[in-house]
Structure formats: C-alpha cells, structure tokens
C-alpha cells in the first residue's frame, strides 16, 4: 500500500497534549488517535506491530506447552460484567476435564482486550482504560510442579522481551495484591517516566518493587538511656517541628500514623521512626483489611499531633502496631498524648515493654539491601509490562476443583 493511501493523519509538530516522547511519536506518526480519556483508536501501522508482538507471545507460550483459548469478555456477575482477569473462567473451562491426575500439568492462555475503570489515564498508552493483554493460567497437582513451571514461565517472559527488543526490562519480586498467592514477580521497563518505584541493589542481584521490599534498620541503641521527660511544646505539631524544637534529627523520633479500617472504621495507630514513610501495602497485608487515612475526632480519645506510645488510650477497639525501625531504640522524642506536650528520652524497651515489631516501612535510597546487607539500595522508576503469580489453590478451592 502506498503511503498516500494510508488512513490517518501525520504531523510534523509535536502535539501539545503529549507529555512523553512515546505518546508524541505515536500521534505524530499516525499510529493512534485519541477518542476519550484513556481510550484510543489504532491505525494500520500500529495494528501490524501488535500482530507481530502477538505472534511472538503465541510462539513463546506454545514452547512451554500452552494452549490458546478464548474466554468471553462478559462475565456473569452483577457488579463486574467485564472481566478484569479470567481466573474463575479458566477454572470453569477445565474443571470437568481435569478430573484425573494424568491430565496435569497443563496451561491455557488467551490474547484479549481488557478493560479497567482507570481513575487517572495518562501518558498515551501507558495508563489506559482499554488494552490488549496476554493472560495465562496453569494447573498442577503439587507445589513442586507449580514452582518448576513458574520458572519456565519466567524464562519465557524474558525471551519475549528480548525478542520484542524492549530494553532494560528487569524482573522484580512483587506483592501479589488482590490477585492473592504468596509469590509473584513483575517485569519492569526501567524509564524515568514510569509510575512504579523499583528497588535495585548495585552490589548484588536483588530486585523488588517498593511494596515488597523489606526495610532494614541499622541504627544502634545508645549506650545509656535518659529518663523519660514530659516537655511543654507550644505550637509544635509535626515531627519536623518536634525535632527542631529538641534540636535533633528525625531519625531519633517516634511518630504516629493513624488509619481506619474500611470494613468497620476501627482505628489503626502505627508507630514508626520519624524519618520513614509507611508502606501501606505491607500494612494492608498484615491486617488483612483495606485502610484509609483516619478522621480523628474528640470522641476517639486521640490527640492529633501529640500521639505517642506511652499511656496511649483510644476509646473503643483499636489496633496498635510498631515498626521494626523502633525496636531496641532509646532516647527518642514522641508525642505525650496531651495537647502541646511531647516526651523526650523514650526508651522502647523500658517504656513500651510489650510492643511487638513488624516491617511496615518503605525502603529508602541508600538503604540496606535485604539480600547482601550493603547500603547500596537504589530507587528507580519503571513501567510494569508483565506479571506472573503463584496463586496456589485460591481459585480452584473456592470453585470446588480441588
């Protein structure tokens, strides 16, 4: 076909609404056309590229004994008519077939248009409401067999990205989130315009996304502990204000971050080192419940800006948690649970003897690598281009296949 006959407009100038280069190139070159927020039509040049990518996907899935199927887009559910993924449909498709152990293992896959009610579409095709996905589902009779096949899938994905020619794709340990299961990996394309934070180590091969990366604290306990002293601190509310008032660093403070559980509005008070941020994915996984930022009222008994672990009182049922960054620490500043008052000289072992500690913190640039122990952690940006999970029996058990 001659170029003059090719449907679609091509432009010399960069479109003003294109923030990143890839979006601008596709619009300028006549690959896509904007229809609505997060929704694009594609012209012939892009369709040819997509078909080639799909062929690579099929070849690599077939190499590991995958069988291509097609699930319906519409699901028999009142609230979720359009299927986000098809775990339930996959179990439904093979449940009667897989009655004998001789049928296992096997894998089915499809390439299909997916839909997301995306709240913030952005950057052309990077975050959209409609896109093409290859999703695969494997079935096994043992955990050992699942783990062996998982490695085959991991290798297949690496071959796919190599054949497609995508540069700098790294496999990182990830949180399974709503998908369930215990083990998962994301394949991340490293790019400054990426939305996800990726934890890399310059000294070893450790890779993880921010949600799954363990935070390790190495701040030692002081040789001597000062006495716990309540201090009048007028107009001091934030952790930065507190540390400035006492002339100390934020790493030597204990701050409270308060949430409420979505299911029952129960308060969750989390104490963490003052210079760290809460990794809310870790918190949700620990609680088994979704949370939101708390609305602190007079009735709850908490004194916003002055919450501390000593003599903490919350009206009603509440969950009180402590991050590992506070374990063994002493000579800290914290809230005194009284307006315009803070403590200095907090010793966690002495003043909060029954505290149990868990990892709820985000790892920081230059932090300690969980694998090699060196302070060579680097935080990069990336775009998720693939994901694999070990889901276990979450779906097969709930649908009476096991």
Place the predicted regions along the sequence by residue.
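TRNA-binding/sensing appendages of the translation machinery
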Residues: 1-77, 132, 137-177, 275-276
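Conserved oxyanion/phosphate-binding beta-strand-loop segments in alpha/beta enzyme cores
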Residues: 1-34, 65, 103-128, 386-387, ...
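Pocket-edge structural micro-motifs
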Residues: 36, 43-44, 83-84, 113, ...
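Hydrophobic alpha-helical hairpins/lids featuring a short glycine-rich hinge
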Residues: 78-113
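Extended, low-hydrophobicity, polar/charged segments
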Residues: 87-95, 120, 125-136, 144-402
